[in-house]
């Protein structure tokens, strides 16, 4: 039974054994221990064995005289489904001279194999888009989309299967904006404001349903500085001309991050969304019921994006963070990864669960971060800090999962170091 969002309450929780027993390779480091890689993400080609990973490479620059980004977006490709990887390539190094830094990478692949990358070229112009036609070896000059905005942050990218329709959302410190392109990212509409309330919305995931409706999953932070956070969905059914916002749930004020240099909203609620081949939507989000308390991971499902099921509890152990969700090849098949510290305050791990019945029940959690050594920030209990604002998950046409996440000893803005780790499996 589908319930209107406003009436949805916790009626049941996910049960174990909703999917076949998974099997993953051991986690592997992207690059080396000397690399300081933050904000990893990944995508898989829908019609080939190519897989891509992107990272924010802290302190990495392509110019010998240091006049191009000192923190740069890098991408690498695998032509054999993650069996081997090519070199990490600067998406816009020397081509972005006099750009101070780059953060927040996003990746997507069109049906013809074109790879789309979006990221921040500082806060102004903010989000830019580039494409690769040769599996990430070279990239086009970045296209801006900020319009009259002088600041934007936290981009989320989605594309239609052909790549013709490109949508991004980002915030400008106070409000959320979305842009659309219907010429394969060559040009973009003026930014459209999607909210008019007392919250600054940050997006963590998006999807395009088979009928073309675009969805972005977001959480709101009070412009006043403290208070409950609405867990929100913004959608467009007219190609990005107009947007409708729905509050799915509300989370209490988040836990405080006490690491040196950590920003106040690091442990805020997050939300993400995926759609399958039938148009079924699964919305995954983090929720705390007590100010400063740990966040649990929940999902809600919908057949139309308007009416949503009651929440299904996926994880209530420790403080959940960094959720990422992706649909599998079959209808009703969704995969979910997240990080939590169930093993101790400074013992973070990455976990995986799957549903094959559209989100009604979920498999038992499987630990992906299985190495208890190999980096100074790792122990058998987990890593010291979830290094990076996001993680990533992609599923290829054979049903293989590709997950990537961050591990470290603190936040990069406070001098912490760490790396990006990944695994694959079914």
Spans of features found by a protein language model:
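Secretory targeting and sorting signals
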Residues: 1-18
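Extracellular, repeat-based ectodomains that mediate carbohydrate processing or recognition
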Residues: 18-426
